[in-house]
A protein has these predicted regions:
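Short, compact, well-ordered microdomains
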Residues: 80-133
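OB-fold ssDNA-binding interfaces and closely related basic DNA-contact patches used
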Residues: 1-53
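Short, intrinsically disordered terminal segments enriched in charged and Pro/Gly residues
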Residues: 137-141
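Ser/Thr- (and often Asn-) enriched beta-sheet segments in non-cytosolic proteins
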Residues: 6, 24, 63, 115-117
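Short acidic DE-rich linear segments
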Residues: 145-148
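Acidic, aromatic-enriched beta-alpha/helix-loop junctions
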Residues: 42-95
């Protein structure tokens, strides 16, 4: 949906060289919750301005789509550090997301929820999708019902 205009330096922590990435914010089609991906821009292609439009595959999916995601706010999502060690710290250092203090224990390990700094249009789109799919966060659903 939206690829951030900021180009971040990212070290994959797996022996690969440092690369340049941009974040993409979208939503999972099954429940409308926030989906965050990283798109790679190899350093030897830095001179190509619209490379991201040519690349359709993300380097990495930062968030994970699980049923408990519907309990989180519109701008929150669980981050899986099993596949990308240290990604939580990287998100914080670069000002992309902040920890919420919410955790979920799964068979794959402990997942931490983060609140992402989203562009307004992305936030509005996710809010709209979650209303359409009836997967709004419970606290917001109760607040809307109390207004009636």
């Amino acid at each position: 949906m939206d690829i951030s205009k900021t180009l971040y330096r990212y070290n994959a922590f797996d022996g690969n060289p440092e690369m340049f990435v941009r974040c993409s914010f979208s939503f999972y089609t099954c429940n409308g919750t926030l989906a965050v991906c990283m798109y790679r821009k190899p350093s030897h292609t830095m001179w190509i301005p619209d490379l991201y439009r040519l690349c359709s595959e993300p380097y990495a999916k930062i968030t994970c789509n699980i049923p408990a995601s519907t309990l989180l706010g519109y701008d929150e999502q669980f981050v899986n550090e099993n596949d990308m060690p240290e990604i939580g710290a990287w998100l914080i250092v670069n000002g992309i997301a902040k920890p919420t203090g919410k955790y979920l224990v799964t068979e794959d390990g402990l997942l931490e929820a983060f609140r992402f700094v989203l562009p307004r249009n992305v936030y509005a789109e996710i809010k709209k999708m979650r209303r359409l799919m009836n997967t709004e966060p419970p606290s917001l659903r109760e607040a809307d019902n109390s207004k009636d």
